[in-house]
Amino acid sequence: ILEYTIRHGFDINNKEALGDEPILTTTKDNRSISIEGSILFRIDKANAPELWENIGDNFVSKVVRPYSRSRISHVLSEVNSKDIPHSRSQIEETLKNELNQLFSDKGIIVEGVLLSDVKILENTIGTERIVFASPTK
């Protein structure tokens, strides 16, 4: 299983590194948020040759990163900010299902999506309010 980590401080300069910077999006109630977390996935052995033939070594920059950013942004744009803490497991399950639909024909299987930090970004520069955070912070 591979872990694609979305976190502050990730170096996006390596296009094929398994990770990304926090995803910035807007909730249904028009609040700007920053999202960190992990996507756990594996290469489907049965479809691995097709993955390498059609996409090659660049599957992170061509598939995992753009699809993950798009789906995370889309799913959280349909949720009100006040509902995020109570809907965390449902959001994670929705993301897992949607990513699996997109990845399955590419030979990638999503095992899980874990949201570790969701922060509401206030209008004041540099101000944020944590919606939920991983226990290690």
Segment roles from a protein language model:
Residues H8-K137:
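Elongated, amphipathic alpha-helices that form coiled-coils and helical stalk/scaffold elements used
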